[in-house]
């Protein structure tokens, strides 16, 4: 069973990220019968997802947010925050540098560090 994955513009996704839309019941009898369901995952604009993150079914990640490496995202993450952990939780409001990257003063290029 597959459900939709909606991704915004300029989304950075690190290596070994798992984005899952399908799930199954914890109850053995229902699982034996093959019951399964799917929920969409929505990733906003200008989101940065660190390496090794797991995103579970039904989660929405808001615009301009940063998800720390190795996090397990089990619930919605609002816009403009830095979140990390297992389970993923808000660490702080995203600051200008967190949301838009760092300007390299030597060459004037913008990059996320």
Regions found by a protein language model. Name each.
Residues 1-59, 94-95, 99-102:
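Flexible, glycine/small-residue-enriched loop-and-beta-strand segment within the central core
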Residues 62-65, 78-80:
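Conserved catalytic segment of ABC-fold P-loop ATPases
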Residues 79-81, 86-104:
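Conserved beta-strand-loop-alpha-helix hinge in the C-terminal portion
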Residues 103-112:
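S-adenosyl-L-methionine-dependent methyltransferase catalytic module, highlighting the catalytic core
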Residues 52, 70, 86-87:
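Gly/Ser/Thr-rich beta-alpha loop segments that engage phosphate groups in nucleotides
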Residues 75:
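Active-site nucleotide-sugar/metal-binding loop of Leloir-type enzymes
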């Amino acid at each position: 069973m597959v459900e939709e994955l909606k991704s915004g513009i300029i989304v950075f996704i690190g290596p070994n990220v798992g984005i899952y839309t399908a799930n199954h019941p914890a109850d053995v009898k229902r699982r034996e019968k093959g019951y399964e369901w799917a929920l969409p995952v929505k990733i906003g604009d200008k989101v940065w997802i660190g390496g090794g993150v797991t995103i579970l079914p039904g989660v929405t990640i808001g615009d301009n947010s940063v998800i720390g490496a190795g996090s397990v995202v089990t619930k919605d993450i609002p816009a403009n925050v830095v979140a990390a952990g297992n389970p993923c939780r808000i660490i702080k409001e995203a600051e200008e540098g967190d949301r838009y990257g760092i300007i390299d003063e030597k060459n004037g290029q913008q990059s996320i560090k």
